[in-house]
Amino acid sequence: RRHTRYPLVTGVQTCALPIFNLDKMIVPFRRTYSDFEAWANNQKSVLQEAYLKSLDKYRTYKKESIKTVNYLAKEFECKKAADQYHRANTANTGVLDTQKLHTFKWNEDLFKKVTTIPDGKNHGLVFYLDWSGSMSQSMVPTLKQLYDLIWFCKKVGIPFRVYAFSDASHNDHLFPGVVAAEKLNDVHIDRSFRLLEFFSSRMNAQTLDKMMEYMYYNCDSFHNSNGSYNYEYSLSGTPLVETIITTPQVLNKFKSEEKVQKVNVVYLSDGEACHPQYNKFITSMNKIYGQPMYGDRICVIRDPKSRYQRKIDLDKGITNAFVEYISNIVDANLLGFRLCSKSEVRLQASFAGIDTIGTVDLNREWEKNKSVAIKGAGFDELYLMALPKTSYNPYRYWNPQEKQTDNEIVVKDNSSKSQLTNAFKKHMNGKMINKTILSKFVGQVA
């Protein structure tokens, strides 16, 4: 057979999902908080000015986000109530309605009715945060999105977990243990792969706020020469495939702990996963090594439990293929968030399997809302959102004359009253994340 990317295909390689040791794979929030607390205390004494400046940014953003969080909560309650009403059931009670007795000659329905509205499902949210080097420039904007969603969860009482996925080489030394056994023909898992639990609904309010403060300074330091990030939690590659296939076991653990029925899984990343591998025995080395899933064979992933299997097609995007695979074996909404520029919309649409001709409407929506929501990308919904104008500019240090407009109203000299009014409205509208995307996201959660 001929393959679109590799001309000679000699056979089919069937791979299975590995069984993860969650106790070794997940670094619990008590450990991550302890590490960041010790690191932050040192930063306060060594780089006090930089830390206080970052702390002021965090507190300012938290205050500004009240409007966004309140909007999210209101939308959630409305959509949840609408869903409950939609599932309402009206039935006869068996008791005569005395006010209808006079209609007995032409009306057969003389009984009182009762409408039953079923209890809403318990909701839960699991977030996966891309902790890769390519995220450094957009980590703070992504973190802000995440913080809004965390505060939303706290306000409406939704249990949540936030895991940063990392395969930094020192993880195996800092957090020792075997994550997954090297079983022949299983999807290969790097020995340094870990899920770092940064935030959890099981944190008390003070601990959660402190961790958010520490993390804001840490992420701000990725591109700020005045600060210094935590090297023990440095950015790594993009083990998104490994993260996606942990979802079934992580969700089972989460549902068991929180007793929730409906779970939404959110992947916050900046693009494609690294190339997947499978465990293959190398005779010359007498050892199992990870081998690329592409080459002279077509790979099929099989879930031993459900027996569901799917061919992995690189031409349709690695991330999309694995997300679509997992969506068939878990009972959850799988959602993706991506901060990107306008030029990346077409690229992301192609990764989503959308014909590039059809991106005309996406471009129009982007121009109008600075965001688009895509379906049919493996995810239940994939959200592409514009990078804030105040996000990291890699050329800032080369152009000292460039002005930063963070939290500033920019107007020209001698502006008219109407120009000042419009500038103020534009500034205030920018304080709130796009309502269209928020409404769609809340609709999925509710």
Predicted regions: what is each one?
Residues 1, 5, 12-446:
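Acidic, glycine-rich A-domain
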